[in-house]
A protein has these predicted regions:
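Conserved class I S-adenosyl-L-methionine
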Residues: 1-39, 57, 139-171
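Class I SAM-dependent methyltransferase SAM/SAH-binding core
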Residues: 45, 51-96
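A short acidic, Gly/Pro-enriched loop at the edge of an enzyme's catalytic core
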Residues: 99-107
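A short SAM/SAH-binding and catalytic strip from SAM-dependent methyltransferases
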Residues: 106-120
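A short glycine-rich, Lys/Arg-flanked "PGG" loop and its adjoining helix->strand segment in the class I
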Residues: 122-134
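Short alpha-helix
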Residues: 195-212
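Conserved S-adenosyl-L-methionine
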Residues: 214-224
Length: 257
């Protein structure tokens, strides 16, 4: 989705977007940030801040906060949602963060690296690394492609229980999971004119390492099963998830054109 698409949905964000800040979501990012030693003296950036869901939390815990987004309407909503004096708002594409080179102790990115171009994804991750001071930390949430496959497997088994014909069960599962909307090699989901990136864990690790991040640790943001999705029948199964990733840069990262 481009800046204009995000501009259009800014006023109805929670109607359009499933976020890790909604009720019943198990989001380890918040506890991680809360437990950082010396956070009161740190400068943190929220890259792709959207309407500012995380900003009040950050402003109350860190010395200074820089909120970055390429959507003017998202930034306007973020400013309304967070009026703390230690927050600076900047309209900037994540593909060029050279203005912030080496300025941050910590960056968070919450489902913000969604570009369908792998070249753009790699560029954003390099730019993100370059904003960090030596030893600086990335704490990011990224949509999981394995979670899509996991849900598909559950749906297939459900359909098999309802049918003696395995091929018919597979066709039903494919329809329910919108198989035609996914590119499982590139890790892309398409809906109408919008395309977005999802990540395999092995792929995300590799891309972050190439961007300059080290000491990577993976966890999960867990989403509840929703009845309106038709998946309440899986409520006893492990939840769907996004990836929660932590990593650091060992030294200052050069800016890449």
């Amino acid at each position: 989705m481009d800046a204009q698409a995000w501009d259009r949905i800014a006023g109805a964000y929670f109607d359009e977007i499933s976020t890790p800040f909604q009720a019943e979501v198990v989001n380890p990012l918040l506890d991680y940030l809360d437990g950082l030693p010396g956070r009161e003296e740190l400068t943190i950036a929220d890259l792709g801040c959207g309407i500012g869901n995380l900003l009040p939390f950050l402003a109350e815990r860190f010395k200074s906060v820089v909120a970055v987004d390429f959507s003017a309407n998202m930034l306007r909503a973020a400013q309304e949602n967070c009026t703390h004096e230690n927050v600076q708002f900047c309209r900037q594409s994540l593909t060029d963060l050279s203005v912030f080179q080496g300025q941050f102790d910590l960056v968070v990115t919450v489902n913000s690296v969604l570009a369908p171009s792998l070249n753009v994804v790699d560029q954003i991750l390099r730019e993100t690394a370059a904003t960090l001071r030596p030893g600086g930390i990335l704490a990011g949430i990224f949509p999981s492609m394995e979670s899509v496959l996991y849900e598909g497997g559950l749906i297939l088994d459900w359909e098999r229980q309802r049918s003696d014909n395995e091929e018919q069960a597979l066709r039903r599962a494919q329809r329910r999971t919108k198989r035609g909307s996914y590119d499982f090699i590139a890790g892309l989901y398409t809906e109408g004119e919008d395309r977005q990136k999802l990540y395999y864990s092995f792929e995300l690790r590799r891309r972050l390492q190439k961007a300059g991040f080290r000491g990577l640790q993976f966890g999960k943001v867990l989403y509840p099963w929703h009845e309106e999705d038709g998946n309440v029948r899986f409520s006893s199964e492990p939840r769907l998830w996004d990836w929660f990733v932590r990593g650091s840069v060992a030294s200052g990262q050069p800016h890449h054109d």
